[in-house]
A protein has these predicted regions:
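Protein kinase catalytic-loop region centered on the HRD/HxD motif
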Residues: 150-162
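C-terminal lobe helix-coil module of Hanks-type protein kinase domains
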Residues: 208-268
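Activation segment signature within eukaryotic-like protein kinase domains
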Residues: 146-147
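Conserved short submotifs of the Hanks-type protein kinase catalytic core
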Residues: 113-127, 131
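Protein kinase glycine-rich loop
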Residues: 17-23, 28
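AlphaC helix of the eukaryotic protein kinase fold
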Residues: 62-97
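Activation-segment/catalytic-loop signature of the eukaryotic protein kinase fold
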Residues: 109
Length: 268
């Protein structure tokens, strides 16, 4: 289903090295970008490690063996595929203009093989989810530092009327310098100056991290930073306790246990 190692895109500009991950809406590859760097010694050709996301709607698509083109099983599926491909391209182009030290940079969005690709900065590091799986509950000072950094990233995108809508530990990378970087704007929404939604989005709910507004189709039609703030708080709870919070839609009948009851080492 994925592109083979060594496959080239954009007439040789990018080369796939291997698959990093795969989800319901796409495949993520590590690759290299062949580019030129100008300096005191002249122009030097170099290879820059990058990350490439391929839009691949797993439940609706298949790949042709010889051409590597992505095809859709049915006409109904093609309507959905095309709709969300256009949304992905639109949002990726917006994000290519958004540069912040705690957000992974988008280099380019392009179409090939009858689908869409996003070339992004490659971050050497691991996600907070992987870090937790490996180390267990994280120390409070470290959690506060990461949450503060992602909060700065969210403030930046919120000022541009963009909601991320999928904040969770697996979408926060910690790079080799220890800096938190927000990734995966695949279900994000952008709003106009009147704070009305200008793009549709794929319905994706990360249970325990999604705000109650995200369970209602009309809950995110108008801009509000609340869904992202809630999800960042839920992420903080998870990092400090090791527990995924009660789903927001169930909180009225299933109270959330206090973090200090689950982790005696954190501030009350």
């Amino acid at each position: 289903m994925n592109l083979p190692n060594g496959h080239v895109l954009q007439n040789g500009k990018y080369r796939i090295t291997h698959v990093i991950g795969q989800g319901g809406f796409g495949i993520t590859y590590k690759g290299v970008w062949y580019t030129e760097v100008k300096g005191s010694l002249g122009t030097v050709q170099t290879e820059v490690p990058i990350c490439i996301k391929e839009y691949f709607f797993k439940d609706y698509c298949y790949r042709e063996t010889e051409s590597f083109a992505v095809k859709v099983h049915s006409e109904t599926g093609k309507v959905l595929f095309d709709k969300f491909k256009e949304k992905l391209i639109k949002e990726a182009k917006i994000l290519s203009e958004v540069h912040h030290p705690h957000i992974v940079n988008v280099l380019e969005v392009f179409e090939e093989n009858d689908t869409a690709y996003i070339a992004m900065e490659y971050i050497s590091g691991c996600s907070l989810k992987y870090m937790m799986d490996r180390e267990g509950i994280l120390p409070e000072p470290k959690v506060l530092r990461y949450v503060r950094q992602i909060g700065e990233a969210l403030q930046f995108v919120h000022e541009k009327n963009i909601l991320h809508l999928d904040i969770k530990p697996s979408n926060i990378l910690i790079d080799s310098s220890g800096k938190a970087r927000l990734i995966d704007f695949g279900v994000s929404k952008r709003y106009d100056i009147e704070q009305q939604e200008t793009s549709t989005t794929m319905l994706t709910l990360s249970k325990g991290f999604a705000s109650i507004e995200q369970y209602d189709n009309e809950g995110t039609q108008s801009f509000s930073p609340c869904p992202d703030i809630y999800s960042l708080g839920a992420t903080m709870y998870n990092l400090l306790t090791g527990k995924i919070p009660t789903e927001s839609i169930l909180r009225a009948t299933r109270p959330l246990q206090k973090p200090s009851e689950l982790n005696k080492d954190i501030s009350p």
